[in-house]
């Protein structure tokens, strides 16, 4: 007898499904809108914890406005974090830690803002930076910001699969596609050349991850300036989404752990029989609210109880704890994070930091390496506009050495 049961069709969650890219772009629009609002809050004397709280409120508010009435999971893919000048990692203090709750932004420091939203598990994260209380930036801070922008644009171009944007005859396209992608060692060397042009250093273990549905740290990763025993794995390919990170320092680029509470966590795939009721209750709330996306203890219902509840969860490996880290020389650090989609047409920036206004960010240094300059002139994607638009884009690329946010 034939099986008459109807089977639920398998959902295509890849970028081949237009709905997937739409969800990524919806999450990206939310991330950008909240980033702009949070950036405006980063003024001299502002308490970091209050900025983070407001950012998360805005994320929740914007997320509720989309995909109304549909059974689609949606939420925060990364809590609002604001990292002071020498901090390397995202920083999100707690209200219940009295001393850290009083931490304020200082005039002239580079504050790194990171946050993100997710729709149906498709998360976008963005990190950008502001110089607190300064409209014009000169000197070493300008060197750092300029270097980070161009290093980031260079990395994005090195992630375009070989031959993807090649023109000419079919034979020429095949030849371009047969070229090998740059190795992670070669990528690191090229990025370091940009950093050195501005007398900066790459922050060790700066890591870009492949994103997947409900996962922001998949199998593939690119690690710049890797430390001892650390290496990246995998080559970017069509159909993938990546979170591309760039971090530079005015110091050595070496990193040290900071004597601060670890407040940023993420659910792992490990299972463990938690013994304490408080631990089980905390984990249950985490899974319900955040799935496997990062969260701050500040976002849980009872912050003080959460500080106790996560201890066994971390010890049992069901939660990953992100240790606060800073520059070993206490030097200013910059950091950017761009979420990209790699399609048959090239790289699309889903979320991206703003291009610095170089009429206000004034470095007296510049890139002179011809190889670097040629790579920076490459497009990130195939042009789909008119001939006039193509010519305008070409002129702009030559003028700025890199493309603007797409």
Task: Annotate each language-model stretch with its function.
Residues 1-406:
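Active-site neighborhoods and metal-handling regions in enzymes and metal-associated proteins
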């Amino acid at each position: 007898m034939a099986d008459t049961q109807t089977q639920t069709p398998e959902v295509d969650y890849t970028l081949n499904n237009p709905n997937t890219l739409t969800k990524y772009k919806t999450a990206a629009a939310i991330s950008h809108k909240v980033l702009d609002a949070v950036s405006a809050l980063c003024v001299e004397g502002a308490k970091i914890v209050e900025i983070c709280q407001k950012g998360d409120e805005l994320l929740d508010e914007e997320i509720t406005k989309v995909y109304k009435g549909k059974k689609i999971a949606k939420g925060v893919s990364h809590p609002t974090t604001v990292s002071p000048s020498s901090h390397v990692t995202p920083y999100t203090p707690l209200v219940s830690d009295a001393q850290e709750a009083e931490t304020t932004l200082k005039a002239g420091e580079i504050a790194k803002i990171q946050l993100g939203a997710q729709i149906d598990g498709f998360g976008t994260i963005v990190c950008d930076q502001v110089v607190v209380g300064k409209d014009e930036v000169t000197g070493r801070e300008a060197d750092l910001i300029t270097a980070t922008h161009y290093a980031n644009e260079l990395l994005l171009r090195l992630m375009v699969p070989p031959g993807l944007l090649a023109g000419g005859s079919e034979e020429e396209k095949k030849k371009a596609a047969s070229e090998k992608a740059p190795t992670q060692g070669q990528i690191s060397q090229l990025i370091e050349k940009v950093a050195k042009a501005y007398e900066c250093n790459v922050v060790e273990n700066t890591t870009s991850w492949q994103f997947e549905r409900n996962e922001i740290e998949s199998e593939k990763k690119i690690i710049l300036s890797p430390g001892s025993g650390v290496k990246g794995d995998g080559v970017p390919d069509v159909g993938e989404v990546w979170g591309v990170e760039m971090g530079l320092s005015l110091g050595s680029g070496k990193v040290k752990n900071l004597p601060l509470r670890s407040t940023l966590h993420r659910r792992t795939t490990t299972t463990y029989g938690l013994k304490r009721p408080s631990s089980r209750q905390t984990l249950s709330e985490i899974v319900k609210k955040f799935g496997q996306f990062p969260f701050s203890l500040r976002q849980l219902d009872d912050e003080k109880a959460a500080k106790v509840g996560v201890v066994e969860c971390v010890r049992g490996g069901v939660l990953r704890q992100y240790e606060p880290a800073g520059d070993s020389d206490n030097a200013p650090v910059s950091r950017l994070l761009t979420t990209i989609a790699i399609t048959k047409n090239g790289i699309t920036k889903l979320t991206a930091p703003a291009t610095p206004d170089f009429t206000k960010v004034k470095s007296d240094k510049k890139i002179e390496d011809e190889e670097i300059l040629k790579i920076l002139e490459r497009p990130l994607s195939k042009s789909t506009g008119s001939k006039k638009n193509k010519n305008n884009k070409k002129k702009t690329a030559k003028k700025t050495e890199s493309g603007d946010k797409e």
